[in-house]
């Protein structure tokens, strides 16, 4: 599933082609996504794009009459293409732009979303979200406070959007490795110093992935069709049985809440 770096990479890739241009119309080939594509999107016509923003894993396209909310789901990606390029099997939604380009949404598993709202504030998919991990609001003191009474393992807690948004399976595993923290540790057992370190490395790992265009394991593509190259720098995720790049110990894979977790039993305590 695309996580924060992949969504932010998509935002940065499509923004220059959308802001200042006008959506002439939308083409919805298959509206049966995780939720049905909102009827308002079918009727889009002559709507200038004012901004392209991101909140958590949602892309937010600001138009004069409202907002398009896009979630990439498990396998979605957005590409900027020439209008004349014919669609392929899993190309479900196009926004045809006034500059001769098209924003094309591809999603083999159809678990993403294209929603419409007049107002962002109070929309059900955006409520109850924690702070952005790259913001000043997410820091060691905040993390320590939220972990203090949490009797659950730190790995699934990091993936809870109420704690912090956008840190999914890949980046939780990678960040815990970078901080030297075992994923099975109780959140409440982390000291303030450990939380400060963990908050710092989460930011560093996410920023590095954004620099590399995110992580492509299967379906994700950047807006120009290129894969995300952070996959080449993964330290533990997807490396079960391979030697740790630091100590040589074989990487271990377990499951938390049906999600794969990768770690080094020597480097993470």
Curated annotation (Swiss-Prot):
EC number in record: 3.2.2.23, 4.2.99.18
Gene Ontology annotations of biological process type: base-excision repair; DNA damage response
Impact upon substituting residue 132 to Q: Decrease of glycosylase activity; slight decrease of AP lyase activity
Recorded superkingdom: Bacteria
Swiss-Prot/TrEMBL cofactor(s): Zn(2+)
One of the record's GO molecular function terms: DNA N-glycosylase activity
InterPro entries, alphabetized: DNA_glyclase/AP_lyase_DNA-bd, DNA_glyclase_Znf_dom_DNA_BS, Formamido-pyr_DNA_Glyclase, FPG_cat, MutM-like_N-ter, Ribosomal_uS13-like_H2TH, Znf_DNA_glyclase/AP_lyase, Znf_FPG/IleRS
Catalytic activity, reaction form: Hydrolysis of DNA containing ring-opened 7-methylguanine residues, releasing 2,6-diamino-4-hydroxy-5-(N-methyl)formamidopyrimidine; 2'-deoxyribonucleotide-(2'-deoxyribose 5'-phosphate)-2'-deoxyribonucleotide-DNA = a 3'-end 2'-deoxyribonucleotide-(2,3-dehydro-2,3-deoxyribose 5'-phosphate)-DNA + a 5'-end 5'-phospho-2'-deoxyribonucleoside-DNA + H(+)
Effect of substituting residue 90 to A: Increase of substrate affinity and decrease of activity
Keywords (A to Z) from UniProt: DNA damage, DNA repair, DNA-binding, Glycosidase, Hydrolase, Lyase, Metal-binding, Multifunctional enzyme, Zinc, Zinc-finger
Result after altering residue 107 to N: No effect on glycosylase and AP lyase activity
Renumbered zinc finger spans (FPG-type): 235-269
Reported impact of residue 6 to Q: Decrease of glycosylase activity; no effect on AP lyase activity
Subunit (UniProt): Monomer.
Family: Belongs to the FPG family.
Task performed by this protein: Involved in base excision repair of DNA damaged by oxidation or by mutagenic agents. Acts as a DNA glycosylase that recognizes and removes damaged bases. Has a preference for oxidized purines, such as 7,8-dihydro-8-oxoguanine (8-oxoG) and its derivatives such as guanidinohydantoin:C and spiroiminodihydantoin:C, however it also acts on thymine glycol:G, 5,6-dihydrouracil:G and 5-hydroxyuracil:G. Has AP (apurinic/apyrimidinic) lyase activity and introduces nicks in the DNA strand.
Name of the featured protein: Formamidopyrimidine-DNA glycosylase
Organism: Escherichia coli (strain K12)
Encoding gene, per UniProt annotation: mutM
């Amino acid at each position: 599933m695309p996580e924060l770096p992949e969504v932010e990479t998509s935002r940065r890739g499509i923004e220059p082609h959308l802001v200042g241009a006008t959506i002439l119309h939308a083409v919805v080939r298959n509206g049966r996504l995780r939720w049905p594509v909102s009827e308002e999107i079918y009727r889009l016509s002559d709507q200038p794009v004012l901004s392209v923003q991101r909140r958590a894993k949602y892309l937010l396209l600001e138009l004069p009459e409202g907002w398009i909310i896009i979630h990439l789901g498990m396998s979605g990606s957005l590409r900027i293409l020439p209008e004349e390029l014919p669609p392929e099997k899993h190309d479900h939604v196009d926004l045809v732009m006034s500059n001769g380009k098209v924003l094309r949404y591809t999603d083999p598993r159809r678990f993403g979303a294209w929603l419409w709202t007049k107002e962002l504030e109070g929309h059900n998919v955006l409520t109850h979200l924690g702070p952005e991990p790259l913001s000043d609001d997410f820091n060691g003191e905040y993390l320590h406070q939220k972990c203090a009474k949490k009797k659950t393992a730190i790995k699934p807690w990091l993936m809870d959007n109420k704690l912090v948004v956008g840190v999914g399976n890949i980046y939780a595993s990678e960040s815990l490795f970078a901080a030297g923290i075992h994923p099975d540790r109780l959140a409440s057992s982390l000291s303030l110093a450990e939380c400060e370190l963990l908050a710092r490395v989460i930011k560093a790992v996410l920023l590095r992935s954004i620099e590399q265009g995110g992580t492509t394991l299967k379906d994700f593509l950047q807006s120009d069709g290129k894969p995300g190259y952070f996959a080449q720098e993964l330290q533990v995720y997807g490396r079960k049985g391979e030697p740790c790049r630091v100590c040589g110990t074989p990487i271990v894979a377990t499951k938390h809440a049906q999600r794969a977790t990768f770690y080094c039993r020597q480097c993470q305590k």
